[in-house]
């Protein structure tokens, strides 16, 4: 019986951590960045690509970011010829696929900022994926494109 207690404890700890380990082991956050806006603004947007190399869907239900009072998932939709932002309760990343949070579509709203981050400043960005946080660094940038897009030449 004395041997079973430590085994049960270890097993219990592993099971308690399994959602976090599963999310961290499967979700890959790439190309995260935050849009730099004038310092008078209280909100801004963040962008990231979420890859799911795993066999099960990933569900993003929210997150957090340094300097932000809260983070919301939003989509840009056309309503009566006007572009509108709509809050999303969740975003699903199918198995083996990726979802891009990018300008003009799905994006992350960073609301109630303590202050606007300066261009070049790096913020910690975390998404709640399958019930566990998955974090990355996001550089604050001016403009709308990622560095890769800014340096491409079109002929």
Annotate each predicted stretch with a short phrase.
Residues 1-6:
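Positively charged n-region of N-terminal signal peptides that target proteins for export
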Residues 8-18:
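Bacterial N-terminal signal peptides
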Residues 18-24:
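Sec/Tat signal peptide C-region and signal peptidase I cleavage site
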Residues 24-155:
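Compact, glycine-rich, soluble single-domain proteins
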């Amino acid at each position: 019986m004395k041997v079973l207690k430590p085994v049960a404890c270890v097993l219990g700890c592993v099971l308690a951590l399994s959602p976090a380990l599963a999310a961290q082991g499967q979700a890959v956050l790439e190309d995260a960045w935050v849009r730099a806006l004038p310092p008078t603004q209280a909100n801004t947007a963040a962008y990231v690509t979420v890859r799911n190399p795993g066999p099960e869907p990933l569900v993003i239900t929210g997150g957090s970011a340094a300097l932000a009072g809260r983070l919301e998932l939003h989509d840009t939709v056309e309503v009566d010829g006007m572009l509108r932002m709509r809050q999303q309760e969740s975003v699903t990343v199918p198995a083996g696929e990726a979802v891009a949070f990018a300008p003009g579509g799905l994006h992350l709203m960073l609301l109630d900022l303590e202050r606007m981050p300066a261009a070049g400043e790096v913020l910690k960005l975390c998404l709640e994926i399958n019930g566990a946080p998955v974090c990355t660094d996001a550089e604050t940038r001016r403009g709308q494109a990622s560095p890769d897009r800014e340096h491409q030449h079109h002929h």
